[in-house]
């Protein structure tokens, strides 16, 4: 036995049905990616919606967009961006996933709740200096 270290082999790529398994992140960015696993695609839609909710929530809290127009704007942008993503960019058959409405509402309520928390949090943080100053009566 020699005193040298044993050389570790690099990990082999995972195989799925005899083909190389492609990572989810590379599929998200490629318009010609094939989505064999429906749950994997629905997970991507769900998390993409959550990212949109955080970004829009911070923007809405900083600007401050409030009321009906703020909520309606969030709903339209959130649904519109995802619809453009899966119908125009990926060009998937919506009927395989239960129709356009099923994909549009996938994870919507949790993203709406996250949006509301981010709006309140960023609005409060942006106006924290007013809350910290105590004015005598």
From Swiss-Prot:
Q: How does it sit in the membrane?
A: Multi-pass membrane protein
Q: Which residues cross the membrane?
A: 45-65, 67-84, 104-127
Q: Which residues form a coiled coil?
A: none
The disorder on record is: Craniofacial dysmorphism, skeletal anomalies and impaired intellectual development syndrome 2: An autosomal recessive disorder characterized by flat face, low-set ears, and cleft lip and palate, as well as costovertebral anomalies including bifid and fused ribs, vertebral segmentation defects, and scoliosis. Intellectual delay can be severe, with absent speech.
A cellular component term, taken from the record's GO annotations: multi-pass translocon complex
What is the native source organism of this protein?
Answer: Homo sapiens
Entry similarity comment: Belongs to the EMC6 family.
* GO biological process annotation, one example: mitochondrial respirasome assembly
Which tissues is it found in, per the record? Expressed in embryonic stem cells and differentiated neuronal cells.
Q: Which residues lie on this side of the membrane: Cytoplasmic?
A: 1-44, 85-103
| Lumenal topological segments | 66, 128-137
* Alphabetized UniProt keyword annotations: Disease variant, Endoplasmic reticulum, Intellectual disability, Membrane, Mitochondrion, Mitochondrion inner membrane, Transmembrane, Transmembrane helix
Function text: Component of the multi-pass translocon (MPT) complex that mediates insertion of multi-pass membrane proteins into the lipid bilayer of membranes. The MPT complex takes over after the SEC61 complex: following membrane insertion of the first few transmembrane segments of proteins by the SEC61 complex, the MPT complex occludes the lateral gate of the SEC61 complex to promote insertion of subsequent transmembrane regions. Within the MPT complex, the GEL subcomplex may mediate insertion of transmembrane regions into the membrane.
List, alphabetically, the InterPro entries matched: EMC6-like (IPR029008), RCAF1 (IPR010742)
Record bears the keyword ATP-binding: no
Subunit note: Component of the GET- and EMC-like (GEL) complex, composed of RAB5IF/OPTI and TMCO1. The GEL complex is part of the multi-pass translocon (MPT) complex, composed of three subcomplexes, the GEL complex (composed of RAB5IF/OPTI and TMCO1), the BOS complex (composed of NCLN/Nicalin, NOMO and TMEM147) and the PAT complex (composed of WDR83OS/Asterix and CCDC47). The MPT complex associates with the SEC61 complex. Interacts with NDUFS3, NDUFA4, NDUFV1, NDUFA9 and NDUFS8 of the mitochondrial membrane respiratory chain NADH dehydrogenase (Complex I).
The protein's name is GEL complex subunit OPTI
């Amino acid at each position: 036995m020699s005193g040298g270290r044993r050389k570790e082999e690099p990990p082999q790529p995972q195989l799925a049905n005899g083909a190389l398994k492609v990572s989810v992140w590379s599929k998200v960015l490629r318009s010609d990616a094939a989505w064999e696993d429906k749950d994997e695609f629905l997970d991507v839609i769900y998390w993409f919606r959550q990212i949109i909710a955080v970004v829009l929530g911070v923007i809405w809290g900083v600007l401050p967009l409030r009321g009906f127009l703020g909520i309606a704007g969030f709903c339209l942008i959130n649904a519109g961006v995802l619809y453009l993503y899966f119908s125009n960019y990926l060009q998937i058959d919506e009927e395989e996933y239960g129709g356009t409405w099923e994909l549009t509402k996938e994870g919507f309520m949790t993203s709406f709740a996250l949006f509301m928390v981010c709006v309140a949090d960023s609005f409060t943080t942006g106006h924290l200096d007013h809350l910290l100053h105590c004015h005598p009566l």
